[in-house]
């Protein structure tokens, strides 16, 4: 009865479940000895062949025997299909054993499925792998689970896999996984302290780089919006500040400013008076010094340097102005170009150490007094320069005539200080370092000069 039940089980495994049944798998599944499992498979094949239903079965055999190869005898064990069984037998000198290894419905192309079937069943029975085996050793004692090297390697591989999985987790919002999960895996003692310090340092550096990137983007956006706001002069100063923030474009902007300053303004109707050559040379020498000082200046002093350079550019513009002789309608305002007084009035402004006392035009005709001694108020056309930034980002200076009202006494006050405070030509050739210190000292000198002019004018009126 027992053998009949076993055969029914084998038939169910092969036909119904379409499994590959090996003698090892059958021994562990049914709990029988391996030799008994081999006999059960052999009987099942013989019974199916007698019933003429064995044509659907494919059988593999385990063959062992001695083989003479290269003049040496050796013992050979092979798993072969039924159609190659006779060929393997003929090669063996002595056949030791032949028994059924596996039964399956499909024909196998290689031994891969057989290996997988035995591997799975042996892995699930590692502690009792020799329980149903034909080879046993009474002196063999199994090791404890903690002492076996295979279990240690298995545990270490699990720990490494867990640590790699945690390391590969992506951080969310700049924060890593909770510290409680990593605490159990970090080594204790000094090594654990060093690892924790390194982790905190990396987090701090990541936090520091993010605000720096935000500051750079905000500065660039603010610099891009600055030139479009304010008046013409505010656009000019905003342009200079934006050039300092953009370090890569600093040299190019400086070259553009030099070119625009050196270009003389275009005259349409009136003749011009040429500036002295010494003044041009000094401006050309001072401009390369400014470019070098811009590159060497630190970031902390950019605001102060921008104010000073803005004043210096104003001085250069005042030096470069070409004053046109205004046309007056009245006969009293006629001006002669060949008179020496006009050349004195058209002389260049003082050096950048002391800025000019007044940006008003200096080519005004001498006052004309009536016979009765009364002053005459009149309107006259004055040539003024206007600066603005064009579409290409270059600074353009244009001169436009504007009408102003003035008296004869005011003209006298403006003419006399201009001729009295005429600077020597050698004073223009000063180093650019003195031009840096000029605006602060020049402010005090300007105030004193204005006070002196007002006092002298007061006495002259009386």
UniProtKB/Swiss-Prot annotation:
Pfam family, one: CDC27
UniProt-listed GO biological process terms: DNA biosynthetic process; DNA repair; DNA-templated DNA replication
Annotated compartments: Cytoplasm; Nucleus
Positions of short motif PIP-box: 452-459
Chief site of localization: cytoplasm
PANTHER family reported in the protein's UniProt record: DNA POLYMERASE DELTA SUBUNIT 3
Name recorded for this polypeptide: DNA polymerase delta subunit 3
